[in-house]
Amino acid sequence: MAVKTYQAGVKEYRQTYWMPEYTPLDTDLLACFKITPQAGVDREEAAAAVAAESSTGTWTTVWTDLLTDMDYYKGRAYRIEDVPGDDTCFYAFIAYPIDLFEEGSVVNVFTSLVGNVFGFKAIRALRLEDIRFPIAYVKTCNGPPNGIQVERDVINKYGRPLLGCTIKPKLGLSGKNYGRAVYECLRGGLDFTKDDENINSQPFMRWKQRFDFVQEATLKAEQETGERKGHYLNVTAPTPDEMFKRAEYAKEIGAPIIMHDYITGGFCANTGLAQWCRDNGMLLHIHRAMHAVLDRNPHHGIHFRVLTKILRLSGGDHLHTGTVVGKLEGDRASTLGWIDLLRESYVPEDRSRGIFFDQDWGSMPGAFAVASGGIHVWHMPALVTIFGDDSVLQFGGGTLGHPWGNAAGAAANRVALEACVQARNEGRQVEKEGREILTAAAQHSPELKIAMETWKEIKFEFDTVDKLDVTNK
């Protein structure tokens, strides 16, 4: 290596970090950023600044650069692309050597890629659109504690989506009344019930009281139906120690599945909890509370496809992914993209779905996609079509809002699901023929008939805020 000499001062980032001739290595971690630069900052300099500030650079040259191989460790901005329909911003593709990141630590990856660089003054707005994790890094992460196949074997249910329900009202019920609602929903035909994300341990219902009543309800429903049932017990807590205390108690009373809010709870806590679940044979349901703070602004933040990849690496057997048809944000093409990233072993680049890189997961198991938020029986044909079998369809208000009560709401959803799955297996176009399929099933199910009458006019037809850039062409 040639002798280097130190020259103090400030130089343009592009002199060191803009490398359009660079060909990424298979072991590089690749990132795509959407950059909106400040006025007067050209694209190459802005891209190089992001590469520098998210890897080895600082605002001035430092003599300690001579003590390491900066040419190896630096991030490299190697490509720039236009954003379709928006000339205020551009895509910058940056390659990072794998040795910049601690093995198995999504915390460390995010600290670099979405750390101080997001407050950099030369950048008006910055969004992390996608990451390609090299297989060499994927193999250092434990991933889902169980995965899709193991969970199906545990609950002994195959060939259809699973049915769930979030207990409502989400806050205010006593432990006994909460357990009663769980029992009625599970007895009526659901596979799972669920704590809402903001149920932890409040004055109206402490966590241990809830766990006890819920497990009693679950066991009673199992005995009466002959099916394996479960309730997602939310162990999210103020401290990691308290979180693990609640998880241990859930295991002690025989609960098959626990739940964590992975963004508000933290990626470090989630990775640790996933490892605990793997060691203790527990299923882990993941809620994405706070995601929209990060991913809904189309110019600044972190796209949900990145948060999906991070969760798969950190660990979780279920992840909320939106519904397309319900009350929450998420267009169809994007949602199908991150569902594949959650479940498939290999996902190729597909700009029509917002996927910027090939992603190889190797042998890492996938996780169930969870559809939840403003859905009811009329949505069932679309949900079965969009999400397929390896999903959990969760109807909260669409179960507990039934005029005849919780058990009737659960029965209506179970009949609707089985009718749609049967029609699909017969080769019918379920989404197109949905009304006919549900109407025929309702002739033999008064619970479904009443549900269809109750929610026939309920739609959530709002435009998506975060559109795929490809749709702007």
Swiss-Prot record:
The record marks K327 as: Transition state stabilizer. Its EC number is 4.1.1.39. Keywords: Calvin cycle, Carbon dioxide fixation, Lyase, Magnesium, Metal-binding, Monooxygenase, Oxidoreductase. The basic functional RuBisCO is composed of a large chain homodimer in a 'head-to-tail' conformation. In form I RuBisCO this homodimer is arranged in a barrel-like tetramer with the small subunits forming a tetrameric 'cap' on each end of the 'barrel'. RuBisCO catalyzes two reactions: the carboxylation of D-ribulose 1,5-bisphosphate, the primary event in carbon dioxide fixation, as well as the oxidative fragmentation of the pentose substrate. Both reactions occur simultaneously and in competition at the same active site. Belongs to the RuBisCO large chain family. Type I subfamily. This is Ribulose bisphosphate carboxylase large chain.
